[in-house]
């Protein structure tokens, strides 16, 4: 099964004049200079024929997070200047690169989490806006690396917490260094090795306990290498890209990830070939996902830690990335979630706190309001909403 494919890039049309800009709503990136188009080339053939065209709006995703975990937001990111620390706010800026007149779009993550009706928070998340220095990539090929991830634990908090604390560390250690012939192939191999190694580490630790841990976790990670997104996921947590279509003058929800559940044909066939079975839509009638980190008792039954990996070229029409676990999408469709966030970003009544830009305040409010609304709509699961702002 092909694990790596391109998400389609929309056809370019001239950016709208001032009149059209007004139809898109107020300017949300007033602290950012306008970006020029990225030179992305013609691209290769579409390898995933199940992906919707960029203009379609089918896709969604929910993110989850652990309250007990040591927060890693911004950990590993470049240190702020004394002035930024004083203001308590880090401006999102574009990283301009002197090659092919390209512009690296700035990325900044925001998150909100709610325990909901569950007894404990079993979700975890990681926001690393810039880990370029830690990855030490080939300077001539890569100028910016960012990492965002959500993990939805089940059977306990240990697998999701372990993945949140260790997956990006393993990724940094395995990230390509020195001479690289193909960045994309090398990054793909790096992600596959990282997931395999992290799962093996957790299973080794889990099996050494008495009694053995039975925790498991989904994983949805977005690795940004310059303006290319690499999305790796296990299970039913999802990543969604909000992209503006200039022809229709509407925003679309583009799915960046693929859900893994035992009822899907390929997943069920793999489980059955390994000696397992699917009952009531679950592995052995118990486990709801067919790929995960942990879940040692199900790994011999065909459950795997091999992620689906997809690639997406960022464009000037991209607004934000939504990462979330199924707690959100039990009560929100992807389109509803994207439109809810957009309405918050256009709300001029949102108060700007001291030390924060208007854009920061709106994105934080969007995360909090969406998480609250999911709980109000009756989501019985933990709810975590992560939104990654794309600077223009």
Swiss-Prot record:
Its main location: cytoplasm. It comes from the Eukaryota. Residues 1-90 are annotated as: Disordered. Gene3D superfamilies: PPM-type phosphatase domain. Inhibited rather than stimulated by magnesium. Protein phosphatase that may play a role in regulation of cell cycle progression via dephosphorylation of its substrates whose appropriate phosphorylation states might be crucial for cell proliferation. Selectively associates with integrin linked kinase (ILK), to modulate cell adhesion and growth factor signaling. Inhibits the ILK-GSK3B signaling axis and may play an important role in inhibiting oncogenic transformation. Keywords: Acetylation, Cytoplasm, Hydrolase, Magnesium, Manganese, Metal-binding, Phosphoprotein, Protein phosphatase. The modification Phosphoserine is found at residue 13. CDD domains: PP2Cc. This is Integrin-linked kinase-associated serine/threonine phosphatase 2C. Binds 2 magnesium or manganese ions per subunit. Changing residue 152 to A: Loss of >90% of activity. It is an enzyme of class 3 (hydrolase). It is found in: Cytoplasm. Residues 108-390 form the PPM-type phosphatase domain. The gene is ILKAP. Pfam families: PP2C (PF00481). The modification N-acetylmethionine is found at residue 1. GO terms for cellular component: cytoplasm.
């Amino acid at each position: 099964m092909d694990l790596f494919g391109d998400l389609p890039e929309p056809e370019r049309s001239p950016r709208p004049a001032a009149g059209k800009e007004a139809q898109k709503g107020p300017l949300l990136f007033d602290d950012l200079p306008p970006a020029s188009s990225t030179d992305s080339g013609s691209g290769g053939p579409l390898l995933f024929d199940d992906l919707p065209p960029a203009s379609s709006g089918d896709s969604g995703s929910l993110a989850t997070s652990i309250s007990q975990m040591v927060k890693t937001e911004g950990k590993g990111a470049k240190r702020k200047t004394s002035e930024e620390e004083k203001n308590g706010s880090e401006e999102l800026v574009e990283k301009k690169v002197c090659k092919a007149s390209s512009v690296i779009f700035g990325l900044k993550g925001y998150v909100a989490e709610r325990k909901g009706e569950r007894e404990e928070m079993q979700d975890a998340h990681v926001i690393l806006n810039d880990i370029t220095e830690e990855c030490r990539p080939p300077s001539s090929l890569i100028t910016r690396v960012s990492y965002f991830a959500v993990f939805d634990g089940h059977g306990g908090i240990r697998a999701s917490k372990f993945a949140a604390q260790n997956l990006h560390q393993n990724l940094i250690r395995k990230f390509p260094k020195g001479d690289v012939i193909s960045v994309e192939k090398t990054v793909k191999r790096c992600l596959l090795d990282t997931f395999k190694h992290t799962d093996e580490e957790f299973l080794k630790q889990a099996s050494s306990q008495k009694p053995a841990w039975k925790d498991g976790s989904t994983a949805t990670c977005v690795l940004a290498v310059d303006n290319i997104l690499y999305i790796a996921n296990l299970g039913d947590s999802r990543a969604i890209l909000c992209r503006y279509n200039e022809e229709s003058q509407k925003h679309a929800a583009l799915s960046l990830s693929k859900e893994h559940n035992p009822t899907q044909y390929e997943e069920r066939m793999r489980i059955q070939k390994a000696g397992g079975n699917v009952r009531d839509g679950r592995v052995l009638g118990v486990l709801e996902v067919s790929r995960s980190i942990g879940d040692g008792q199900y790994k011999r039954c065909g459950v795997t830690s091999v992620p689906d990996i997809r690639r997406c070229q960022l464009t000037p029409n991209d607004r934000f990335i939504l990462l979330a676990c199924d707690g959100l999408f039990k009560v929100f469709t992807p389109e509803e979630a994207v439109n809810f966030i957009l309405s918050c970003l256009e709300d001029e009544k949102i108060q700007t706190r001291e030390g924060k830009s208007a854009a920061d305040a709106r994105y934080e409010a969007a995360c909090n309001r969406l998480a609250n609304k999911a709980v109000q709509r009756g989501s019985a699961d933990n709810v975590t909403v992560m939104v990654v702002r794309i600077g223009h």
